[in-house]
Amino acid sequence: MKEMGVIVLLLLHSFFYVAFCFNDGLLPNGDFELGPRHSDMKGTQVINITAIPNWELSGFVEYIPSGHKQGDMILVVPKGAFAVRLGNEASIKQKISVKKGSYYSITFSAARTCAQDERLNVSVAPHHAVMPIQTVYSSSGWDLYSWAFKAQSDYADIVIHNPGVEEDPACGPLIDGVAMRALFPPRPTNKNILKNGGFEEGPWVLPNISSGVLIPPNSIDDHSPLPGWMVESLKAVKYIDSDHFSVPQGRRAVELVAGKESAVAQVVRTIPGKTYVLSFSVGDASNACAGSMIVEAFAGKDTIKVPYESKGKGGFKRSSLRFVAVSSRTRVMFYSTFYAMRNDDFSSLCGPVIDDVKLLSARRP
């Protein structure tokens, strides 16, 4: 009998380890396609905190089918048939096994359902970020957001919370497609002083969703989902992949989607008085973002403006900035001079793409 008890305990331990074990991609039931039973529902409201498999709920949480009608608005789910809506002070939580001291990025889809200034609080203790989702970057109303954290223990409680207090308790954001990816921050090499200059290391990109992933401003993100880089602006930048967009080099790149309000930067070690060359690619993502574009690149106090005539069908050009370092640390930064909209829907923000950014020392001419 004692041996049987030991076997049962071992089986239970094995079950919980498998249940919480992390792999890059969607979290268990991260797309919410496994839903609650009818007995756990009151209309669209979920009344049992453990009714949605793999998730723990708190507050007014709704289970929304694609095509659900809210007033005059039809709610569309970006992928699959279901999503969840978080009412006032509502949250969803899932525990995942991680490696203490390692970095991870979280990706999720979110959409506003009301006109209020909606926000989301994403957290893995002790880290958290309040993400404004008022600005809609795509015509579908759904945007993919990313956030990153450093694991403080071997388990992480991922919480997505709606901190809003609205007159209508059901007036909250829709959430879908929650995924996670382990990050491996790159180091400078003898071929590039910049870290992650090709943007190959970044958040998880959901397959079959062609909107790209928004990386929020650094002011609300202690650990960047784009290792090595900071988003030093009021608006997000967009992380794009070669499966859905035209990318100058490799499989990933960054699209500057909000003019001068959308900038990426990195601080690098330099030797005062030494000459350096900053080289990079400027192009378009083949997403109908056509017109005259200008990317402004900065290296310390030096700058260059790179014009690019986009036909919205892909393509790029190389450019470079030669400068002499004036301090032991130099800030490299990029932003777009102008705002742009896709010419096929006139409501999706877009902009020039930057990629393959390199910084090397050079001899003076």
From Swiss-Prot:
The lineage of its organism: Eukaryota, Viridiplantae, Streptophyta, Embryophyta, Tracheophyta. Coiled coil: none annotated. It comes from the Eukaryota. It holds the Pfam family DUF642. GO terms for cellular component: extracellular region; plant-type cell wall. SUPFAM superfamilies: Galactose-binding domain-like. Mainly expressed in vascular tissues of roots, leaves, stamens and petals. The keyword Secreted applies. Disruption phenotype: Decreased PME3 activity in leaves associated with empty short siliques missing seeds or with heterogeneous seeds, as well as several morphological and developmental defects, such as abnormal carpel morphology, decreased stigma size, septum with engrossed regions and badly differentiated ovules tissues. Misshapen embryos with modified methyl esterification status of homogalacturonans in seeds and associated with abnormal radical and embryo bending. Residues 1-21 form the signal peptide. Interacts with PME3. GO terms for biological process: auxin-activated signaling pathway; embryo development ending in seed dormancy; embryonic morphogenesis; gravitropism; pectin biosynthetic process; positive regulation of seed germination; regulation of auxin polar transport; regulation of cell wall pectin metabolic process. Together with At5g11420, acts as a positive regulator of PME3 activity during several developmental processes, including reproductive organ development, hypocotyls elongation, seed germination and endosperm (testa) rupture at the micropyle, probably by modulating the pectin methylation status in cell walls. Involved in the regulation of pectin methylation degree to modulate cell wall physiology during cell separation, hypocotyl growth and embryo development. This is Protein BIIDXI. 'BIIDXI' means seed in the Zapotec language. Glycans are attached at N48, N121, N208. Induction: By auxin (IAA and NPA) and gibberellic acid (GA) during germination and in roots. Highly and early up-regulated in roots during root-knot nematode Meloidogyne incognita infection. It is found in: Secreted, Cell wall. Keywords: Auxin signaling pathway, Cell wall, Developmental protein, Glycoprotein, Secreted, Signal.
